[in-house]
Amino acid sequence: MSRAVGIDFGTTNSAVAIADDGGAVTLLPLPAPGGGVTSTWRTILYFESGEDPGQVLISAGAAAIERYAESGGQGRLIQSIKSHLASELFSGTHAAGRHYRIEELIATFLRKLRGAVAVDLGRRAVVGRPVRYWGAQTAEDQTRALDRTRPRWRWPASTTSLSNTSRSRRPAATPPAWITRSWW
């Protein structure tokens, strides 16, 4: 049985779902605050310095919020990463003593999201993307956002065993659409 994997990388929340050949779609459980589970994960990263020189500890989703609260805000909390893709004014940021390009921030979040899923996702996925990125006021802004997403899908693929990722405009990237089209 083959299955399609879909990742909704959202500005505020993200989710992962699978659809099997029979059309059954399942949102996968992700860790929630307090040890529970949820079907959506906050699209948020938290960076803090580790005990060893140069060590950087990175948390994502619910764990990022918990670490931020536990540390008294001593690290760097980064949210709404996707909302900066179209902006020429934001190309990256500093956190825990080093610079991270926006592509690295997104790839880091996607690796953490994939690692939080307790199911083998296989090696292929469809990643939803907006028809128009937030803040894209010109064709150049939209192109910038799209250019910044190209490396982020390849990079997580090479570091998380996803060998075949494709981007699809929403709502075509939603689970029912995956099983009715020949994406693979």
Language-model features and meaning:
Residues 149-158:
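Short helix-loop-beta junction
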Residues 18-19, 137-141, 172-176:
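Short acidic, glycine/serine/threonine-rich loops at helix termini
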Residues 7-13, 130, 177-184:
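A short acidic Gly-Thr/Ser loop motif
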Residues 10, 19, 128-130, 164:
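Generic beta-strand/beta-sheet core signal
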Residues 23-150:
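Phosphate-binding loop and its immediate beta->loop->alpha context
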Residues 1-5, 12, 19-25, 155-156:
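N-terminal glycine/serine-rich phosphate-binding loop of ATP-dependent small-molecule kinases
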Residues 14-18, 43-46:
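Short beta-strand scaffold segments in enzyme catalytic cores
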Residues 1-3, 157-184:
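Conserved phosphate-binding catalytic cores of ATP/NTP-utilizing and phosphoryl-transfer enzymes
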